From Swiss-Prot:
Functional description taken from the UniProt entry: Catalyzes the reversible isomerization-deamination of glucosamine 6-phosphate (GlcN6P) to form fructose 6-phosphate (Fru6P) and ammonium ion.
Catalytic function, reaction form: alpha-D-glucosamine 6-phosphate + H2O = beta-D-fructose 6-phosphate + NH4(+)
GO cellular component: cytoplasm
Name of the protein in its database record: Glucosamine-6-phosphate deaminase
């Protein structure tokens, strides 16, 4: 695990840009992407840069169940606003939040992920150690699945919605087993509220109770953290 400590999230975005450029230069074709406030500065830096994804493919970690792609709170909309409109990929894939059959949708996405092997996977980490929507207790062998969001995750996501009642209660998420197949994983964490999760991920035992701790078993992980997120590390 390579740990890069930065002053703040803006500097973190600049470091992440270097990782993306190195991946492209080394021939990576498929990029696994994440959403939320953590990768926003990374996408800002990608948009400002001369990086070209026109021959690349993107696959996203997750999507809310029940939100149309044009819904402003959907992850499909987020990706367009923050990255795809300015830096289009040859192909971009997300789970379909409006799929009628959840099992079929998970199967479809897994087949897609087998076809497009992820060279670089971008991750954030939840306060409870989740990666994607793989909450504590998730199987380390998991594939794409429909997951009921924990109350802590619903609370954390409620800031993006007018009312907490509007926050979706389910999401489709890439499984931990699938995430671990990525050649390289880039995890970002910023802010004091991520410090406990970061400590558990890096220094704690590998346990399903801290899903991100499984990254200790991956051969090529880059962690970008700011001073606050790193504050509890030895």
């Amino acid at each position: 695990m390579k740990i890069i400590k930065v002053k703040d999230q803006v500097e973190g975005g600049k470091e992440a840009l270097k990782v993306f450029k190195e991946a492209l230069d080394s021939g990576v074709k498929v990029f696994g992407l994440a959403t939320g406030s953590t990768p926003e500065t990374t996408y800002d830096e990608l948009v400002k840069s001369d990086i070209d994804f026109s021959n690349s493919i993107s696959v996203n970690l997750d999507e809310y169940v029940g939100l149309k792609p044009e819904d402003e709170q959907s992850y499909a909309y987020f990706m367009k606003e923050h990255l795809f409109n300015a830096k289009p990929f040859a192909k971009s894939f997300l789970p379909n939040g409006m799929a009628e059959d959840a099992d079929q949708e998970c199967e479809r996405y897994d087949k897609l992920l087998e076809e497009y092997h992820v060279g670089l996977q971008l991750l954030g980490i939840g306060r409870n150690g989740h990666i994607g929507f793989n909450e504590p207790g998730s199987s380390f062998d998991g594939k794409t699945h429909k997951v009921a969001l924990t109350q802590s995750t619903i609370n954390a996501n409620s800031r993006f919605f007018d009312n907490e009642e509007d926050v979706p209660k389910y999401a489709y998420s890439m499984g931990i087993g699938t995430i671990m197949k990525s050649d390289t994983i880039l995890l970002e964490a910023f802010g004091k509220n991520k410090a406990e999760a970061v400590k558990a991920m890096i220094e704690g035992p590998v346990t399903p109770e801290v899903p991100a701790s499984v990254l200790q078993n991956h051969p090529d992980v880059v962690v970008i953290i700011d001073e606050e997120a790193a504050s509890l590390l030895k």
